[in-house]
Amino acid sequence: MRFFAFSKNGWKKYFLLPVLSMLSAGTSVSGASADWNEKTIRDNLQLVAEWQAKHPKKRSPLHWTYGAFYSGLVQYGLSVPEGPGLPLLRKAGEEQGWKTLNRHYHADDHAVGHAWMEMAMEDGNPAAAEKIRAVLDKVMNRPSSASLQFLTPGCQDRWSWSDALFMSPPVFVKLAAYTGDRRYLEFMDREYKLTCDYLFDREEGLFFRDSRYFTVPAANGKKMFWSRGNGWVIAGLPLILQDMPADWPSRPFYEDLLKRLAAALKKCQSSDGSWHASLLDPDEPPLKEMSGTLFIMYGMLWGVNQGYLDADEYLPSICKAWKAACDAVSKEGALGWVQPIADKPGHYSGKDTEVYGAGAYLMAGSELRKYVIDRDHPQKKTVTVTNPLGRFRPAETVSVPWPSGGSGDAAGLRVFDVRHGRVIPHQLADTDGDGTTDTLLFQSNFRPGTVRDFWILENSCLGEAPSADVCFSRPVPERLDDFAWENDLTAHRIYGPAVARPAPEGEGLVSSGTDVWSKRAGAPVINEFYKRGDYHRDHGRGLDMYNVGPGRGCGGIAVFRDGKPHVSGNWASARTLYNGPVQTAFEVVYAPWDIGGGVRVAETRRVTLDAGNRFSKVRSVLNVRGAETVKAGVGMDTGKRRNDYEAVMEDRESGGLMTAWSRPRKDDGCLGTAVIVPWVPEGRAVDAEGCTYLLRKVANGEPFEWYMGAVWDKASPIRSAAGWEAEARRVRECIGHPLQVRVR
């Protein structure tokens, strides 16, 4: 029969075996159709994930078998966030305290770290990484020197068996991505290559499971290579490569190993589409085995999707493997034909299931879903984003001109995160205020030195990403002309004309400083606070405990003359430009004020705040009359009088930075505030009237940028002045090294 599949070079006709004719839902006798259709694949993944979750094995949820299941579950969960995958993982991690079993040097007990590290980065949850990091720090700092010869004392404290190359190395790479500490990569590199040199058979291009099988042949007299043992290796390589920096010196070693192993495994595929347990003796036993098959399929398909493997050459094998796998799924979602826990080929039946088999199915199916989405959108645009820094960058916004070669029609527009296989929230914005949409905004996390692709899909039938306008700003006329803005992490307000009036019409407060609202992460508070009115006490969502007064609060401008700061009054006009799931933007105008010597200054300020960020970006333009230039100061409150500061830090390296840590009220926790300027200040910081300023010369109409941010220790993993300073330094480094974006 003829089967048509999409290759990287277009549609190609394959002449496959008659057994492959059952590639449609109408002829499948299993519970999982083998159709290469996005919804069908997604339904299959949910079916298998839910069945396995409802049928747990009687062993620790931290066992390596569950580690392999979680590896598939996290890929499925990240690709279908509305599905059951991520909730199941969060529940498992929280119930187990994100820990590992007690064999700290044993690779098997590291396997749960795949999912724990992904959840740490996905959720911004450092607790998910702490315990696995402590374990691997111990392994790295006090490495074992045991022999790799299997069954010798301490051999399993090293990666002396092929399974270990899946269980442990990817966790080291993920820790390097999360922490920016390249020592994890160096350790992994050294140990991996030693194991590869020891277990890899260069003649056959396959891995022995361990050294016992160097001399133990298969029943037919050929070398014994176990399919799942090789499946572990080829499935582990994508987990390593996807988080390894693009410029890592030995990256080509892993790329070449993927190609060599895939080529050798392709030759071993049986006519039923699977890889039998014994690769060179498929009659030992003559049965399809699904865990090895699906791990191998995943590694091959990832290689195709990334361009390492030729699609025309490997797609027929992948098609046959997926058909065999779907035929092994019952109508209830149980994946059968999975060899039980073993270290060599053995016997099993269609009734044998295992959690690692389901994990392999979720990995392979999630990767296949990406391929199908690629195939179904031939007109897509690709946005390639490079992180030039050697550090993890959470919640970074990517800005792309719109329309970028497309129709400019927002209907059916989707932004697809290729790494995670999911549609992500996006926002179309008019960033220059001319009434025309000009920019596409979206966000992701970026790991050190990595290159990521995102697809812009127009007229797509994929479902929209769940999103809410978490980035929000508005004028608040009902509260004396406040103007407030917030995202999922932080909230602020500035003061308008009405509050400056004397009582009883106003409060007599003249201030162009910025207030900080302490809020619980994820909870919108602006409308609730103003509706309640009583926001100076914490009713569960946060409170206003910060004292601004006439100072700069957590960020503001002063113009200096003769060494003295001159500040504006309250804002004269303020308007929201746009709100959305990624960014809010607004414009504020401060009316002209006298700075002496016949000089008057006005400020127009544009402020943006992105989701997942604690810092607002400010672009100020001064309108100067009576002088060619003035000395502007970007400042923040640092004096004891208003907020009882416990620590204040100022640094001028690579751009100015100030941080402060205060306890405005005894029982309501601490606030961190900070100002960052992406330019080198003139001289040292200047203290004046309870505030500290970073100075620069500014000409009339010359824009300059600065950032202000805040954190509340009761709603953040940042719990100290040192932690807040480290976060501000991280943000400053990211500001100085923006993401590199290319559209093609």
Language-model regions: role of each:
Residues 603-605, 609, 614-649:
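Acidic (Asp/Glu-rich), glycine- and aromatic
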Residues 455, 460-565:
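Solvent-exposed N-terminal domain segments of exported/luminal and surface proteins
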Residues 433-446, 673-744:
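Beta-strand-rich recognition/accessory modules
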Residues 86-90, 98-214, 219-223, 331-332:
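Extended ligand-binding groove/face enriched in aromatic
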Residues 378-473, 509:
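Alpha-mannosidase-like glycoside hydrolase catalytic domains involved in N-glycan trimming
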Residues 35-67, 74-95, 99-122, 126-138, ...:
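CBM-like carbohydrate-recognition segments
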